[in-house]
Amino acid sequence: TPAARFPVEPGERVLDLCAAPGGKATALGAALQGKGVLVANDISNSRAKALLKNLEVFGISNAFVTNEVPQNLAERFEGFFDKVLIDAPCSGEGMFRKDPAVIKTWEEERPEYFAKLQKDILKNGVRMLRPGGKLLYSTCTFAPVENEGSISWILEQCPEMELIPIE
């Protein structure tokens, strides 16, 4: 999972910007070992409720759940977080292998639609990073416009950022 590839230290301030249903958030919360804070956000009210339940079931006590669009959070938490995880909503091409029925629902314009949404999420996620903070961006699609395209775009917008390879 993306959370398993994102080193989090106890005491850090961590944001999971697209957190529901909570698998990534519970892993991040466990890594914090009760120290620091985890903000787990999802824009869907019903998904945020499921997220809250999962964090409670796993006993993550230093987390709170928000149900906000990224721009609203960025206005309140500018430069606040040490780490920001964005497992962005996407066109889902990576699900084709797991669920062939997904292929039938795919539409040609979906990657462009999601790339636009991802850029907005990325822009606001970066705003919430403290100087020197780290952001991990992931999707479950193969569409270059949603992966390399979104990363190239944010690096152009934020020249102070650098790409760090993950092994």
Descriptions of predicted regions:
Residues T1-E167:
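S-adenosylmethionine
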